[in-house]
Amino acid sequence: MSEKIQAIRGMHDILPDMTPRWQQVEHQIRSVMANYGYREIRLPIVEKTELFKRSIGEVTDIVEKEMYVFEDRNGDSLTLRPEGTAGCLRACLEHGLLHNQTHRLWYAGPMFRHERPQKGRYRQFHQVGVEVFGMPGPDIDAELIFLSRRLWQRLGVAHKLRLELNSLGTPDERLAYRQILVDYLRENYDALDADSARRLETNPLRILDSKNPAMKDLLAGAPVLADHLGGASRAHFEGLTELLDAAEIPYVINPRLVRGLDYYCNTVFEWVTDELGTQGTVCAGGRYDGLVAQLGGRDSSAIGFALGMERLIELTGETFAENAPHIYFITVGTAAERRGAVLAEMLRDAFPSLRLVVNCGGGSFKNQFKRADKSAAAFALVLGEDEMRDDSISLKPLRSDDAQQTVAQADLVRLIQSCVPI
């Protein structure tokens, strides 16, 4: 026997017993996006490597260590997308969507990063992204938070998540603060761990986000970015917090929240939980006003967020039940199988939401009832030799002690209507 081929490490299968939970979460996402007037955009999984180098930054961990990069037959360097913002913006610029226009967009799909797999972190993972272009004020920042909070409420997880905020200011303000932070960290170089020492030369603001407990005291004494913001940046952030206060949305201002991508400015935010171990960030985003020009467009304001589907679905737990069949249709004998196929299609016409599984492959009554029970269906619809002879059909409850009912086949629709909650 040949050796079985396994899935690539860090790339997981979503099996049929889990897909109902995914589908139900996806349904709520689509519903909330429609509530707020956001339109879906569908994007390629593969983009030119240069897109991510220019947008994410060449000295970030993602570009340096985590991207799946390959050459096609023409020698072009291509990359499996590690995030969605750059591809969404590329599509908007390529198709002229941003010319004197505002847009509220969303997308969903797999992303790829060559990280060390662990609980809640995969090399292929799924994100839902939201991007807004052409709206510079704090009101749209607040709308994204309102939208995400409404999704948590729909999914029954709002009580498990808390909102953390910060402002990174303008690129110039952040650059000036960067030097102040670097000076402080160099004075305390011996206290840096190996990862922070490396980041000191490449992306020092990411040191503020260190999860190493040994760095806690050092970072507690570090200069705070908020103390180095200009008046316009302060006013923008205050405008956001005032809107959140008015909507009675609780939040924590976290001066160490910096985000992992170079293109962020002004507002940044995360929805975090304590219920998923170290992988506590479920949703994160912020402003990236300079990225449009960086990728060849005109200067334009932009803001967005991404949420991790795997983490969100784990957080929902058993909030959503599996979509088990309403009915398992048992047919015994060739004539019953033929008649059953016709009746099944009639029921699907009459009840578009009906989940009906028809037994295929034959089998005795006993074996078919075992399959019906294993399917978790609520009812068994039975069509055997006796029913064929009498032109009748029987409905047997499988999850209660209610009595089996037998009616004429002509009355089947009325029977289903009265007995099966669809």
UniProtKB/Swiss-Prot annotation:
This is Histidine--tRNA ligase. It comes from the Bacteria. It comes from Methylococcus capsulatus (strain ATCC 33009 / NCIMB 11132 / Bath). Homodimer. PANTHER family: HISTIDINE--TRNA LIGASE, MITOCHONDRIAL-RELATED (PTHR43707:SF1), HISTIDYL-TRNA SYNTHETASE (PTHR43707). CDD domains: HisRS-like_core (cd00773), HisRS_anticodon (cd00859). The lineage of its organism: Bacteria, Pseudomonadati, Pseudomonadota, Gammaproteobacteria, Methylococcales. It catalyses: tRNA(His) + L-histidine + ATP = L-histidyl-tRNA(His) + AMP + diphosphate + H(+). InterPro entries: aa-tRNA-synth_II, aa-tRNA-synth_II/BPL/LPL, Anticodon-bd, Anticodon-bd_dom_sf, His-tRNA-ligase, HisRS-like_core, HisRS/HisZ, HisRS_anticodon.
